[in-house]
A protein has these predicted regions:
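Juxtamembrane membrane-interface segments in integral membrane proteins
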Residues: 26-34, 55-131, 141, 147, ...
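Generic alpha-helical transmembrane segments of integral inner-membrane proteins
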Residues: 2, 43-56, 127, 131, ...
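Anchoring transmembrane alpha helix of integral membrane proteins
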Residues: 1-63, 299, 303-325
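Membrane-interface starts of transmembrane alpha-helices
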Residues: 36-45, 154, 158-161, 219-222, ...
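Hydrophobic alpha-helical transmembrane segments of membrane transport and translocation systems
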Residues: 241-325
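Transmembrane helix interruption/hinge and helix-loop junction motifs
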Residues: 2-10, 195-201, 217, 235-238, ...
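Alpha-helical transmembrane segments and their immediate interhelical loop/hinge regions
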Residues: 123-230, 234, 238-244
Length: 325
């Protein structure tokens, strides 16, 4: 498949488009700031948005580096505790039919950590190309409207194309804004909870929660598993681990299933089945980056398909209700 074979080209390009939306969304917040009754100019706001993004990017890398290096030192201790716990579980009646030794051998913490770090490395490996693409997109924005006028001299066609682009911009920016807020809120609550329980590497687990919540459906599930799993190896008793697991699930459910739908409303208008299939498709051909980019790609595709009679039926299938974007 072309998309899979050219992943090194397309992934940074799509990431750059998403990053561009992130930057202009942050810049719009800076533009709301008034200094002596004057709003911050767009150029300065965009520069501040770039600095903000770079700050959080390097903060993310620093947190991962510090926590992973510290965790690797204590990894043998955690591995021994996990195997001891699994062997103790053999005494439980309904577990006796399970091959405990095989299960113990299959659970490798170093492999789990390697997978997490590998996923992060995959994303960061595209950093240089993504930043370069983003720079050129920012430079092209200045002449974008002029090019649209030249490409579509017919007034009606130009209005239609401009309307499609405007809807894409509005929905993607709103998605970035709401999803970032929801993920940050979830991560903050999980971080406080982990601190209260005394779980080690709370900052790392909170960061992982923030990042994974951008992956639809399965991201929050994965984020709910790791902190209790590692707390199980830290605490002597199972009771606090179970309470911690329940509270994390409550946080994820309350925000993901109650707050987020209220904030999103009918913004995305995507079928849950379409999201699941899209997640599987883009995850298969582009791996973890594809999972993160699944929603923006589906939103853009849905709006474009809805505006052409030959592809309108695809938009109907992608939409979450009878009203097509």
């Amino acid at each position: 498949m072309v998309l899979h074979g050219a992943a090194a080209l397309f992934i940074p390009l799509v990431l750059a488009v998403v990053l561009w939306y992130v930057l202009i969304t942050i810049a719009s917040y800076y533009q709301r700031i008034q200094i002596r009754n004057t709003h911050i100019p767009y150029g300065i706001a965009l520069f501040l948005a770039i600095l903000t993004s770079l700050f959080f990017f390097f903060l993310l890398i620093e947190i991962i580096r510090d926590n992973v290096s510290e965790f690797l030192v204590t990894l043998p201790v955690y591995q021994a505790k996990l195997q001891s716990f699994i062997l103790e579980a053999e005494k439980i009646p309904f577990v006796r039919g399970i091959d405990i030794n095989e299960l113990s051998n299959q659970i490798d913490l170093s492999a789990i950590v390697t997978a997490i770090v590998g996923g992060v490395n995959t994303l960061t490996s595209y950093t240089a190309a993504t930043m370069l693409y983003t720079l050129f997109i920012l430079l092209e924005c200045r002449s974008f409207n002029t090019k649209i006028d030249r490409l579509f001299p017919d007034t009606e066609k130009r209005k239609k194309v401009s309307g499609v682009i405007q809807r894409i911009n509005t929905q993607i920016q709103e998605y970035v804004r709401i999803q970032t807020f929801v993920s940050a809120l979830t991560a903050a609550l999980v971080y406080v909870l982990l601190l209260l329980f005394g779980v080690q590497y709370a900052a790392f687990w909170a960061l992982l929660t923030f990042v994974l919540n951008f992956i639809p459906t399965i991201g929050s599930m994965i984020a709910s598993v790791f902190p209790p799993l590692f707390a199980l190896m830290q605490f002597e008793s199972v009771a606090p681990v179970l309470i911690l697991a329940v509270l994390i699930v409550v946080i994820q459910f309350s925000i993901g299933s109650i707050l987020q739908p209220r904030l999103m409303g009918s913004l995305l208008n995507l079928s849950p089945l379409a999201i699941l299939i899209g997640l599987a498709f883009w995850g298969t051909i582009w791996g973890i980056p594809g999972m993160f980019l699944c929603i923006p790609i589906l939103v853009i595709a849905n709006i474009i398909f809805a505006n052409f009679s030959s592809t309108y039926w695809i938009s109907v299938l992608l939409s979450g209700n009878e009203k097509v974007s």
